[in-house]
Amino acid sequence: MPHSSPGAPLDPVAFIHSQIRTVPDWPQPGVQFRDITTLLQSPKALRILVDLFVERYVDAKLDYVAGLDARGFIIAPIVAYELSVGFVPIRKVGKLPYKTRSESYDLEYGSATVEIHEDACKPGDRVIIMDDLIATGGTMMAGRNLLQRLGAEVVEGAAIIDLPDLGGSTLLRNAGLPVYTVTEFAGH
C-alpha cells in the first residue's frame, strides 16, 4: 500500500486499487483472482468507493441500479440507496421467484444464464448495471440485453475493476454500452 505524508491529499482511485487483494492461482492455476472482500472490510475504502459511484451518477436521472449476481449485489444496492433509486437484481437462473426473462451467454468452458423479473423495470426507465469486475464482459452484456428487452435505457455499465487484457470492456463499448470502472489490473 502506498504511503503518503500526513495531510497529503488522498488519491481515491489509487487507494481503492491498494485495498484489493490478489489471490494467485485461484480458482485455478494461472488465474490472479481480484478479491474485493478486503476493500469491503475497510469502512474508509467502502465509503470512498460508494462516493465515487454516487458522484458519477448523482445527476444521471436514474430510475434503478441493476446488480449482477453475485458480487454486483454487494455494491449496487448501496449505490442505489445513496442515489434514492430502486435496485434491480439480475440473478443466476432459477433464483428469482416470479415470472422471469432469461439470457444465456458463453463462458470460456460452456455457458451460463441470468434472469430478471419481467416487471423489474418499464420502458424508458434509466438504469446503470453494476458488477464487481469486468473480465470477458459476458455477464454484463447479458444483463444489458435483459434490461433492454424490458424497454429500459441502459445508461452505463459500471464495475469496481476492469481486466482490460480479457477484452470485456472493449466488447461492451463496441456493443454501444459505455463503461465506467474505478480501477484496472493487467492480466487475468
Curated annotation (Swiss-Prot):
Is Membrane a UniProt keyword of this protein? no
User: Keywords of this protein's UniProt record, alphabetized?
Assistant: Cytoplasm, Glycosyltransferase, Purine salvage, Transferase
| Xref: InterPro entries | Ade_phspho_trans (IPR005764), Adenine_PRTase (IPR050120), PRibTrfase_dom (IPR000836), PRTase-like (IPR029057)
- According to its UniProt record, what is one Pfam family this protein matches? Pribosyltran
Of the GO CC terms on this record, one is: cytosol
Q: Where in the cell is it found?
A: Cytoplasm
Please tell me which top-level EC class this enzyme sits in. transferase
Q: Which SUPFAM superfamilies match?
A: PRTase-like
Task: Give the enzyme's EC designation.
Answer: 2.4.2.7
Give one GO term, molecular function aspect.
adenine phosphoribosyltransferase activity
The record's Gene Ontology biological-process terms are: adenine salvage; AMP salvage; purine ribonucleoside salvage
Please list the reactions this protein catalyses. AMP + diphosphate = 5-phospho-alpha-D-ribose 1-diphosphate + adenine
Taxonomy, superkingdom: Bacteria
User: Is Chloroplast set as a keyword in this record?
Assistant: no
> Which cystines does this chain contain?
none
What pathway is this protein a component of?
Purine metabolism; AMP biosynthesis via salvage pathway; AMP from adenine: step 1/1
Describe the family membership recorded for this protein in Swiss-Prot or TrEMBL.
Answer: Belongs to the purine/pyrimidine phosphoribosyltransferase family.
Purpose = Catalyzes a salvage reaction resulting in the formation of AMP, that is energically less costly than de novo synthesis.
What NCBIfam families does the record point to? apt, PRK02304.1-3, PRK02304.1-5
Its subunit composition reads: Homodimer.
Protein name, please?
Adenine phosphoribosyltransferase
Q: Which organism is it from?
A: Burkholderia orbicola (strain MC0-3)
At the highest ranks, the source species' classification is:
Bacteria, Pseudomonadati, Pseudomonadota, Betaproteobacteria, Burkholderiales
